[in-house]
Amino acid sequence: MFLKTESFEHNGVTVTLSELSALQRIEHLALMKRQAEQAESDSNRKFTVEDAIRTGAFLVAMSLWHNHPQKTQMPSMNEAVKQIEQEVLTTWPTEAISHAENVVYRLSGMYEFVVNNAPEQTEDAGPAEPVSAGKCSTVS
């Protein structure tokens, strides 16, 4: 009703993504907090690629719920979102999940929760180091 929406297209398929409602934002932030607490309590626990994909699928599912047929077929929003999340995980490629997740963050004005808060570089600072998903290692 009041939420912003945007069409999202991937491989010729278009869906409507919605801004997260206030309740959904709270649920998403609670998930992020639980993940951070788990990482702190277990020093060996790292935020994995699987965690990133599942978190993205959950966020996308919450966004899709607003215009999804499951919205009226399930007794609760949480049950419907879980089912939509499974649909996203089983039918969407990871690239689409990631791109859709970014759209939802933008629609919801939530980039401040996921953007690195590192100080901005000045022009004199020189080029930034390249970002790599691989492990750092020394070559001998």
Curated annotation (Swiss-Prot):
Lineage: superkingdom: Viruses
Keywords: Host cytoplasm, Late protein, Viral release from host cell, Viral tail assembly
Subcellular location(s) per record: Host cytoplasm
Span list, region Disordered: 121-140
Family (UniProt): Belongs to the lambda-like tail assembly protein family.
Subunit composition and interactions: Interacts with the tail assembly protein GT and the tape measure protein.
Purpose of the protein: Promotes tail assembly by creating a scaffold for the tail tube proteins. Tail assembly proteins G and GT probably wrap the linear tape measure protein to create a tail assembly scaffold. This allows the polymerization of the tail tube protein, during which G and GT are released, therefore they are absent in the mature virion. The tail assembly protein GT is produced by a rare -1 ribosomal frameshift. The ratio of translated G/GT is about 20, and this ratio is important for proper tail assembly.
Protein name per Swiss-Prot or TrEMBL: Tail assembly protein G
Organism: Escherichia phage lambda
The gene coding this protein: G
